[in-house]
């Protein structure tokens, strides 16, 4: 009945608009111009084929020289200049979309100084994990809560309003709101505009926008989301022509020259801010500089630059020139450099002046015939070029030409962790950067108005997951702190100080965070937290959420890939799971014979590359100079990750371990991660690594190598306690029959446990 009444009212208004158009002698085209609509839109409104927005009716009344009441009601409504009464449930509905209902409480009152609205805002779980959409309009706004809870953001400040609470703010300040507390929120909004108030003002203020933002990268990326903003599918377009430095960095600089690209702190916390224009010009100078040194397309150039801001100038310059960037950590020693220089045929290196790194390079140089150019950053040294002084002498323009690198040309190489042998060289094309759009947009939850902080140092692949490609594809800024040693108490105050909105760190650092008293720090600016690098123990997840209210969204990928599995924005997550497969990757779990395993059974995570999707943007091109190793992991249309997981009935994946790490005991296949997670629940355990130990009867048994917290003594009684705890909290056959206490666990340079040395 109510729907029918409203429909009849709108039909009557549409008929009066048509009548008045004929009386005034306007054509549909003229009225479309008067109401700022297209002719097609105007015709639909007048014919009653579409709901009539209040703004449209208001503009029609102005064009006809009528009061809006005359047009809406068909009478003069003179009394509406002194007062108006709106009975319960009788307000004029002006918007009902995206979980929002807005009713104007005084639609016919003349010469209003403000617009009062009755607003119902549905609770949306997905909205709890996204940044609040912010908007502006002229004047001021007053909101009072009638029922439920409303989370309101005004500028950088956030308030939770309960029943009876109210807020008044300048609506020219960016603001937005969502319902919280698990149920809908009903409130009264009064919009006081500097100009004539209309329905459009409150819609822009109150109705939340969709999650999609218009990015320049949409020439190359097409995403489809559901009504909650969850990613359904994503395709890449024009990827064969793509070059991140030209098509993203330079394009943003051209359109938004003053937009912040990076906020950088050096080790002394000296702050520098770089716009996209700064990055564009500095990378052009770097490209011209490298070219003058004889570096050319296809040359391999190593970057050992910690978190120095010059890293961004250099890598973008190499991307423009076509030389292949090879990031590496400053922890390398002589033999590490010697192996890498020769394995990749490194011809030039940009190296930090900090510490002993340059000396280690010089020691390795004598056995590295391909290395001809050494460039120092942050200092000077005999036999080295000085980057900071020399690159500034070159032009800040570097034109794109017909032979500029793009698409399938090699852009980047990473050395793998080397947990089972010498590190391999994973080679990536220019399409790799596009693959990280999902990483940033749907996992990190990066938006153009935010600042993202990924902890990782630039020598690791994870740094480029979170400090460059995806974040700038989303036109967001990155925060970089060039610290030497991780200290939770040093980093935690930075979130509030620099209004960091999204954050990513490995599980180890979250473990360090939860050992701090987090109540001492203001972490309210953080909208979203993520982790990757190793599986996250559920206990760490629970403790971090208990102390901060933030859930940690886990993701999975490799040096050879972009994000392949993850807990994405808009989807519910299960604590301890890896999440679901990313739409751009066709994932399958297989047994040792390559057959797909049923749900609930362990299988190796593989990526199909022989389907219509082909090789996805983000998957590596192969191991450089190592065809045999490439064929070993990539054959019969499958790329084998060597990681084992199982999938539940809802499609979530659960990590078991590396294929080489799975323990085979008495016919059981036991993943080390599950046992490690249980042992890590014990308050006196600092670190734990589970591995296989040979056994004459069972073939293998579970061995737990444990590092205790300072002050805790490892005893036989403690071993028994740990064994009994595992028996109680998981299947008894999985308990560690061998428990050893160690001062530290053997790890790779990247910090991953080397299980075959336990």
How would you label these PLM feature ranges?
Residues 272-277, 411-435:
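Conserved AMP-binding A3 loop
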Residues 258-316, 333-338, 389-392, 430-431:
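Conserved AMP-binding/adenylate-forming core of the ANL superfamily
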Residues 473, 500-505, 514-574, 586:
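Gly/Ser/Thr-rich phosphate-binding loop
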Residues 581-584, 595-632, 670, 713:
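Conserved ATP/PPi-binding loop(s) of AMP-dependent carboxylate-activating enzymes
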Residues 434-454, 458-501, 516:
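Conserved AMP-binding/adenylation subdomain of ANL enzymes
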Residues 207-213, 320-389, 710:
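Structural core segment of the AMP-binding/adenylate-forming
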Residues 332-335, 339, 349-354, 503, ...:
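AMP-binding/adenylate-forming catalytic core of the ANL superfamily
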Residues 257-260, 375-376, 381-383, 392-415, ...:
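Conserved pre-ATP/AMP-binding loop-to-beta segment of ANL
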